[in-house]
């Protein structure tokens, strides 16, 4: 019997599409896809509303991503004409095989990364102009918090498993994932869980606040830093209030509770300021209602979410593609887990795009 590490290497070298998603004890690998659904603005509703019979298999699920543009369209927020590489708005796969990798990925490629210099999609003057316009919008009360997207691009072919394995060693994140398909790959070291739905229970875990690890800075000192830092505290409070409000739209009255408030989570190179919010879903709520209420994730957009999305979309000249969309799975029994796609690389048509 082959070890899971050997099976991973064999699957990678076979050229077959596969997905790796961080689990509590290691990683889950999904492959042997029997269906691939490319989403667009017309079919996303039917995809989310369709019901499948569960055979109580670990592979009774669809796994994939919703892009930023698709999520905007789902809540009737229009995006003006932007530069677009025509990458799919969302893709979901039905796996027939799942492997559990209970330790590190331990994969190293002999190939060296070859890429040209990175080009940034917005120059300093343009960024400053947008920044100053948004400052005026904050002063006039149109938004309270807003987050601009910047992209770095280079011509390159990448080995996604090699990149993902190395990133997992240097920056292991609880919502990390990678997708390798024939014509594209995605790598993300996302730390943020946007939705975990089990039965009628739903949780969200907003992150707002980051400090780099330095010598002598432990979790207690990091917590004191966040508490004393007015900017970090106010930003966190705003995002938590917004996520509670989003949950309240789909949950039973009085069921939305803050279970963990302003705790510090430790990563290899930094500390995050985190809260955990739980709720009990209303009986009539469907998965499409949850997606519409919670996505795109507010902590990487700003607040109030709807108005802020419109402001961003009118100023940003290039499509975000996967960035600030969501990756995860929908089980046949209706349970879901989705992250927010940040700290990501999209490789498509031999262009690597970091957002």
PLM features per residue range, with description:
Residues 1-355:
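Extended alpha-helical targeting/anchoring segments
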